[in-house]
Amino acid sequence: MEEETKVVKKVTGPAKPQKLRSIDVELAQKLNTGSSQTKSSALYKLRSVVKNEKLTEIQLLKIWKGLFLSLYNTDKPIVQEEFSRDISKLTTYFKDYKDSLMFIKCFFIILQKHWDYIDKYRVDKFYSLVRKMLNSSFQILKKRNAQHEEGSEEEEARLALNEQIYSGLVKIFKSTVLNTSSDSTTNTNGVLLHFADIYLEELFKVTQGHMEPINLTKILLPFVNFLTKSEDDVSCKRIKERVFDRLLTTYSPFDKKDAYYLPKVGVSSSTPEIFPTDYEMFSKLFFKCASSKDTLEQNRKTLYGLKNQFKRAQAALEELEELADNIVLDENGDIVENPNVNPEDLQGDDSDDSDEEFDVDQMDSEDSGEGEFDDEIDADDAEELDDDDDEEFDEELDEEDEEEEEEEEEEVPPPPPTKNLKSKPSPVTQKNKQQQQQPPAKPAPITKKQQQSPAKPTQVTKKQQSPAKPTPVTKKQQSPVKPTSPKVVKKPTRK
């Protein structure tokens, strides 16, 4: 009996206290279950934990791992949209904005780490989650942006808080989705490309363009840093087209749309989307980055191009402001004449116009006097042109005579082929030679092939031609030698 009692004591003795699971592990496991009720209850509990407890970065990473797997296994588009919306709303439930920023940072870390596991059938719902999380990130700015009286302590505290939130978001985007270092958590740029596509759209949805130009410049600094240091040409091109080119067209007062703009509901010419952009500041910023020693050589061309684009946009904006100063609208919104214009100024303008008309008449009279002198010059030129026409007419007659001689030479049978001469006598020297000899019998016409033959006895070389320069053959000298009657051609008259 004693042995039996001892055994019973060992079995039925007090159990060791089990180690309690932390709240983050428990929530992650419940979120990863297949039951929709368990997921909804875990999400509701997570909402209360976020409001009342302070979580560390490691705990938030574990929670986001469970949320990622839960969305990965969720089917049906409507259910996916509701689940993504509930997840994104958690960002605004934190009491301290630092915890909200930490929650956003952990989201991008987990998403980039597991992006390679997302296939083409699940990528759309994660794109939707990225859009909603980015919208919630900008909601933090709007939530902390309550206006107070200028110069008050509350207003100064609000400005300091906004400065911290903007700088915090910039650091998160630089270290996660827009990270340019080689030790990045992912080798893909899928998140970055979609992030650049939706950045300005979600920012305008939250702010409606009501933000200071300096804050807009701060919130776009991660993209400028990426263009300066990144070696990814595809991502740099996407950022230029979807962020900065869009800032110069779609979200500008110039009534332009970028090449990738899609029409939206409720957006028209009467309600344009405009950001208060400081184009001059961006131009100086791009110039400073392009001329920096740390900038990659392959990215300088893009940065200098953006610098020139923003500089031209600043000049165009100044022209619009000058035009807007001269426009006055009535109660109905119609354009009316500016009442500040002095009528005496208009009269002064009329007197100036009369003076200009007088000057124009005087200039016309001066031009008419110069015209007579020009007529005299034209008459002298006409005489010179007539002399030139005579010389051209004589040259035409010479060419016709040569053509007739060539036709007669073609009738004679050609001699046997011989070697070609390097030098060829000119037709003018042949005519002079015929005039000097004047044989009693008419010699046979000389063909081109006979002129080229080396066996010709009477051959004129360049040395023989050099001392005695032949005089130009005139029309009278050619007439007695011609075997045929010269053609009579009327001399053209100059009009």
UniProtKB/Swiss-Prot annotation:
Keywords: Nucleus, rRNA processing. It is found in: Nucleus. This is Ribosomal RNA processing protein 1 homolog. GO terms for biological process: rRNA processing. May be involved in the generation of 28S rRNA. It comes from the Eukaryota. Residues 427-452 have a biased composition (Low complexity). Residues 334-495 are annotated as: Disordered. Residues 453-478 have a biased composition (Polar residues). The keyword Transcription does not apply. Residues 346-412 have a biased composition (Acidic residues). InterPro entries: RRP1.
